[in-house]
Each structure stands twice: as structure tokens, then as C-alpha cells.
């Protein structure tokens, strides 16, 4: 049964022809699974709300939709009854509200009054329910959808007892990546000196694009950013507002009609997607000749600018687990957290104090769900977690693209035994070196993992790529392309040795790929693997889409424009070697840039 596209309502907002077409595409995409799983289809107006928030980029709007749905499910924001306790009291507390004026650009203005928040008296998920409820009321307006939202965090008269770091992180994550509204700016007003420390923690989550929108202001400076007509009296404005009664206007006459999102939120999307939809080039895919022409037209600077378009986008999802105080020491770098939505979860074992956290993310490959696990270079305090992950995910191949030290800095710990017949024990897992092969550009080590609890043994092949320079990228992609083929061949042989698998199952376990942070060289390696697979099977590829999608699973993948440009260069180098383009033609063009 084909999903039906919701008709455009008579009272729907006016859209351009391009926006209407994007809305139809969005609804077709979302309603594929609403039909399949007997969930009510999404309405036209709700679709427009998500598309407005992402400037009618269909792919990003779909990602936002699922992030919004998952956030509401995770935080228990479902079946809201604003006339019943405790939600009613939380709404009427006045700590969060929507002003009845707009800024000069037409943006709606939301106000959080910190001094009214008392964490010891509030239940956090109820606070979030009230926040969602009131924000939803704001973005029901087409004007707000089109012109965005200004968020004022009023800290005047508050103290440390009014502050809740975890709530602050959740609200920020909500505003920047999990709510259908264009966030224009955040004004933090009257922040005490002690706020600098928690803000520095929160700011680790922010991309430059979001950080630039946040202003920390004195009360006297607010009118430089918003006219007095848009501000309450206590912030130097003209609006008379009684926070104790203001929010009565947002309560419905009765509990109202059921939220159509309740059914969608409560529905659990199956964990496995159709492999044929994973990392398949979209409508903007290029043939290899089109790619040559594209690179010659854009040139190096143009490709760098294309990367900046990707980098400026906020991560889609949340980082709650990575930023939990108990897990911070497990992150090699404080500014490289791990998305909650795609993180690998370890099994908690009785008698052990470990959490289920490791800084590692499932990443899709070409036509394969969870083809890779992108992770950081293990720290001494995470060696055991690393090998537990390898065991639990039935990993057969590990790819390391860094050395232990580079440029005089420690990049990765020695988490496996280096010499033949040596072994290291990690809890109930013992890792033994069965042999080492030293090649020109890489080292191959065969390892055996012995699970003493289950009395089982498995072999894992560890590859360490040695030809990546300490700084920048390789001058030629030849050695990396050869290395990638060796890795793929080893994975295929290892999977084959497991025996035939029935049709419909995941064809193979993930390959673990890591560098130091687990995003730069790791993202480059995986992007190249995906794009070359696209090219070999379909004759077309899409670098921009591949990297953009990858960053929704392993946030910040590909760290520099140089690495992004290297992907293009490597693909063209591969194409020349395979005779897909005339020898020397494409590389000469690139080398001249």
C-alpha cells in the first residue's frame, strides 16, 4: 500500500511552489512507515512546521522530526494533560512563558525566569513537559515558524540553588536540534560570576553557528538587542507582566483533543532500517565525469566552502550520556562527545560498577546498517570497555589510523599486546597476540579474545595504518585505497568463515574504526569506503550527502576542510587507477589548485 500524501488544507500557510514540493516529499518520506506500521499519517501543517525549522531541506527536516519524536519519548513528554497536576502547576509557575509581542523581525520571544525554578521542588521531566507544551503553543503560529524564536534566560536575582546543569543542557539540546523552531538567538541576562563554569561545560556541545547566537548580557545591555516594547519591565522594557497569572491564557478550555503526536511518539520505530535505503546516493548523485567537472569548477576553495556548509550545521541529537559527570573521564577530548541516539551501549554486569557508556557510535555504510563503529583511541581507563564492546558486537576487524604519539602528543593508548604470544587481561577477557605482519604502509596483527566467563574464543584482526602524516592529509591516496581494500577483503573472509547467513539478517558485524578523537581520520576512512562502494556498484556517488548523513550518527565526523577535500581527491585518484577517467586528467586539475 502506497502512503497517501496529506492534502493541502484550505487554511494552510502560503508557501512557494518549491516549498510545497518539499512538503510533499517530506510527507511521502515520513508516511512510508506510518502506513507500514499502521500509525496515523502526519498532517500537512505539522510537516510545514518541521520544514520551516530546517529551511525546507527535506533530509534535515526528516532527521529533526525523528529527533523530536525520540526526545519526547525519552523524556516522557506524551499524553500531556495541562489541566491536571503536576503539569498545571508547572505551567502556571511562570518560570517559562511566551511573551505576547514579537521582535522587529517577527520572531516570537520565550522567557525563562531562573529565580522561579527550584530544582528540589520540581520534577525535571514535568518541567520539560511544560516547556514543550508552551513552545508548541508558540510554533503553532505560522509567523513564528517563518520568523523564528528568541530565547531569553533571565538569571537576574537568581542564585546557585536555582540552577540545574542537567536541565540547562537538555533545554539547549532541545532548542538547537530537537524542536521544530528556528532559534534566532539566546540572551542570557544577569548571569552571576559562578555561571561561567557550568556555561563552559554546556558550550562544549555547541557548534560555532550556535555559539555565535548566544549573548551573555548585563541587564542594562538587553535593550541594545531588543527594543523596550519587546521586554518585560524588570529587563528595562515596557511590558507589564504578572508571572503568577500570565500563563493562564495558554491553558485550553478543556484538556483538549488528543495530541496527534502521542501515537507517533509511543510507536517504537524498528531498530533495523531497510539496508537498501542506507547511504544510497540521492537525486544529486554525480557520475565520475560529473565529479571531475564539479571539482574543476568549484576548485579547492569551493570544496572548502562546501565543507563549511556542513560544519556549520548543528549536530542532530543529544549528548546527555557523554556529558554526564560520571562519564566525562571516559572521553579523550572534552569537545568530542558522543550522540545519545547512535551510541554503542555496553552490557551492565552484576558486581561491576561500570556504566554502559563508551565514546563509540554506530555508523551506517553503503547498503548496510551499522557497518562501522566509530570510536576514539582508547584511554587506559577505557581499555576494558573497548574490548567488551568488541566482544559484545562480535567485531572481526579493528582499523586504527593513528600512531600512539604524533607531533609529540599522545594520541592513543596501547590497548593490545604488541609482541607475538604476549597477552593482556581485561577483566574476564584475555587478549593474546597470535602474530604480526609488517607491511609497507600498515601493520596487521592477529589477536585472540578469550572470554573466561563464557569459555569462548574468537579471532580479531587488528590493522594499524602507518602512512598518515602527523599533520594534514596524505599527499597521495594510493596507500589508503590499497589499505581499504585489504581491510574489506579481511572483513569478507572473516564473515565467510562464520558460515552462511540467512537472507534478511544483517550481513556482517561492524568494523571498528578509530583514530585519536574518532572523527577526523575515522570519518575520512568511512566516507571514502562508502563513496567508493557507491561508485563501483552504481557508477554514481554523493560526497556531500555521505558526510552530512555520517555526522548525524558520529557527530563532527571529518574535522577539517582538508580532510573533506582529500575525499574528493582520493575518489578521483581511485577512478584514474581503475580507468574510469583518462590518466592524469583529473589529478592534474586538482594539483593545480
From Swiss-Prot:
Binding site for substrate: 470, 515-521, 559
InterPro entries: CRAL-TRIO_dom (IPR001251), CRAL-TRIO_dom_sf (IPR036865), CRAL/TRIO_N_dom_sf (IPR036273), Prot-tyrosine_phosphatase-like (IPR029021), Protein-Tyr_Phosphatase (IPR050348), PTP_cat (IPR000242), Tyr_Pase_AS (IPR016130), Tyr_Pase_cat (IPR003595)
Superkingdom in the source lineage: Eukaryota
GO biological process: negative regulation of neuron projection development; positive regulation of protein localization to plasma membrane; signal transduction
Domain Tyrosine-protein phosphatase: 303-574
Single GO MF annotation: protein tyrosine phosphatase activity
Catalytic activity: O-phospho-L-tyrosyl-[protein] + H2O = L-tyrosyl-[protein] + phosphate
Active site: 515 (phosphocysteine intermediate)
EC id: 3.1.3.48
Keywords: Acetylation, Cytoplasm, Hydrolase, Protein phosphatase
CRAL-TRIO domain ranges (all copies): 84-243
Modified residues (N-acetylmethionine): 1
Cell compartments where the protein resides: Cytoplasm
Pfam family, one: CRAL_TRIO
Gene3D superfamilies the record matches: CRAL-TRIO lipid binding domain, N-terminal domain of phosphatidylinositol transfer protein sec14p, Protein tyrosine phosphatase superfamily
Cellular component per GO, a single term: cytoplasm
Region annotation (Disordered) ranges: 1-21
Function: Protein-tyrosine phosphatase that could participate in the transfer of hydrophobic ligands or in functions of the Golgi apparatus.
The family this protein is said to belong to: Belongs to the protein-tyrosine phosphatase family. Non-receptor class 3 subfamily.
Protein name: Tyrosine-protein phosphatase non-receptor type 9
Record organism: Rattus norvegicus
Primary gene name: Ptpn9
Amino acid at each position: 500500500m502506497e502512503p497517501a500524501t496529506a492534502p493541502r488544507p484550505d487554511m494552510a500557510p502560503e508557501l512557494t511552489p518549491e516549498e510545497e514540493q518539499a512538503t510533499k516529499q517530506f510527507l511521502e518520506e515520513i508516511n512510508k512507515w506510518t502506513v507500514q506500521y499502521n500509525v496515523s499519517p502526519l498532517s500537512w501543517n505539522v510537516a510545514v512546521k518541521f520544514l520551516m525549522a530546517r529551511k525546507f531541506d527535506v533530509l534535515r527536516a526528516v532527521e529533526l522530526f525523528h529527533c523530536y519524536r525520540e526526545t519526547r519519548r525519552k523524556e516522557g513528554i506524551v499524553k500531556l494533560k495541562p489541566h491536571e497536576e503536576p503539569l498545571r502547576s508547572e505551567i502556571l509557575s511562570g518560570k517559562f512563558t511566551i511573551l505576547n509581542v514579537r521582535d522587529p523581525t517577527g520572531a516570537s520571544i520565550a522567557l525563562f525566569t531562573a529565580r522561579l525554578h527550584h530544582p528540589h521542588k520540581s520534577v525535571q521531566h514535568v518541567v520539560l513537559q511544560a516547556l514543550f507544551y508552551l513552545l508548541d503553543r508558540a510554533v503553532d503560529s505560522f509567523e513564528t515558524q517563518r520568523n523564528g524564536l528568541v530565547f531569553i534566560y533571565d538569571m537576574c536575582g537568581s542564585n546557585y540553588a536555582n540552577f540545574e546543569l542537567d536541565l540547562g543542557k537538555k533545554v539547549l539540546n532541545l532548542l538547537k536540534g530537537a524542536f521544530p523552531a528556528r532559534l534566532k538567538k539566546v540572551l542570557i541576562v544577569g548571569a552571576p560570576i559562578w555561571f561561567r563554569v557550568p556555561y563552559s561545560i554546556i558550550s562544549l556541545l555547541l557548534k560555532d553557528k550556535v555559539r555565535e547566537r548566544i549573548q551573555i548580557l548585563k541587564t542594562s545591555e538587553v535593550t541594545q538587542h531588543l527594543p523596550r516594547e519587546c521586554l518585560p519591565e524588570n529587563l528595562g522594557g515596557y511590558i507589564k507582566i504578572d508571572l503568577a497569572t500570565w500563563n493562564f491564557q495558554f491553558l485550553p478550555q478543556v484538556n483538549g483533543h488528543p495530541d496527534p503526536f502521542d501515537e507517533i511518539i509511543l510507536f517504537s520505530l524498528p531498530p533495523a532500517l531497510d539496508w537498501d535505503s542506507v547511504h544510497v546516493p540521492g537525486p544529486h548523485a554525480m557520475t565520475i565525469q560529473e565529479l571531475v567537472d564539479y571539482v574543476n569548477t568549484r576548485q579547492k576553495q569551493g570544496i572548502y566552502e562546501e565543507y563549511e556548509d556542513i560544519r556549520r550545521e548543528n549536530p542532530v541529537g543529544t549528548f546527555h550520556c557523554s556529558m554526564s559527570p560520571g562519564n566525562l573521564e571516559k572521553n579523550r577530548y572534552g569537545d568530542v562527545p558522543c550522540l545519545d541516539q547512535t551510541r554503542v551501549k555496553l552490557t551492565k554486569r552484576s558486581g561491576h560498577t561500570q556504566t554502559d557508556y563508551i565514546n563509540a557510535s554506530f555508523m551506517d555504510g553503503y547498503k548496510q546498517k551499522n557497518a562501522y563503529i566509530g570510536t576514539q583511541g582508547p584511554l587506559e581507563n577505557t581499555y576494558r570497555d573497548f574490548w567488551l564492546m568488541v566482544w559484545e558486537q562480535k567485531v572481526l576487524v579493528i582499523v586504527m589510523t593513528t600512531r600512539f604519539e604524533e607531533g609529540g602528543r599522545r594520541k592513543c593508548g596501547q590497548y593490545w599486546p604488541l609482541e607475538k604470544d604476549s597477552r593482556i587481561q581485561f577483566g574476564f577477557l584475555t587478549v593474546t597476540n597470535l602474530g604480526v605482519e609488517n607491511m609497507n604502509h600498515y601493520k596487521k596483527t592477529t589477536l585472540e579474545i578469550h572470554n573466561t566467563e563464557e569459555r569462548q574464543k574468537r579471532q580479531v584482526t587488528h590493522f594499524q595504518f602507518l602512512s598518515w602524516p602527523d599533520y594534514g592529509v596524505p599527499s597521495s591516496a594510493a596507500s589508503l585505497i590499497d589499505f581499504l581494500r585489504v581491510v574489506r577483503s579481511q572483513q569478507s573472509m572473516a564473515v565467510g568463515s562464520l558460515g552462511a547467513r540467512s537472507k534478511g539478517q544483517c550481513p556482517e558485524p561492524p568494523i571498528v574504526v578509530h583514530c585519536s578523537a574518532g572523527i577526523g581520520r575515522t570519518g575520512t576512512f568511512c566516507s571514502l569506503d562508502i563513496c567508493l562502494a557507491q561508485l563501483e556498484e552504481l557508477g554514481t556517488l554523493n560526497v556531500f550527502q555521505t558526510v552530512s548523513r555520517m555526522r548525524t550518527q558520529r557527530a563532527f565526523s571529518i574535522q577539517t576542510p582538508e580532510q573533506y577535500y582529500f575525499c574528493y581527491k582520493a575518489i578521483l585518484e581511485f577512478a584514474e587507477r581503475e580507468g574510469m577517467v583518462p590518466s592524469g586528467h583529473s589529478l592534474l586539475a586538482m594539483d593545480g589548485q
